[in-house]
């Protein structure tokens, strides 16, 4: 369910719906709670401010048992909404496909070059299947598009499929920039 960020400072989340954030995560994760923060990439936070048309994902960087707080890879504004997430590989591959299709619908139908920036968190989760996200992008663009890219620790881009030009720092996403001759 959607929750309200009731207490935060910069990138530290103290409370969701008036409850300690870490306690709520522990209830949500059950047996997986011992895996935090080492398995943090599997349990990110979907975050959206009042000004955003579409939310973004925030990765857990650490937890503080003493304060019941959690540190994320990006600021979290009080009064915003949040949703606890669980990642799976098929959704990551599907997200890469959606990103490639969004590029084509936003510009040239046959770009000559695509630069792919994929979060290192995606690589950690996907392990041996990491090539699947590149294969699906290659399939969407076709052989005329040369692909290059790198793994990053944060992707700066507008939110997908929106006309909102505002850029945000994203975590655990794939961002694609294409170039075409006109």
Where is each model-derived feature located?
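Small-residue-enriched flexible segments
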Residues: 1-127, 131-142, 150-182
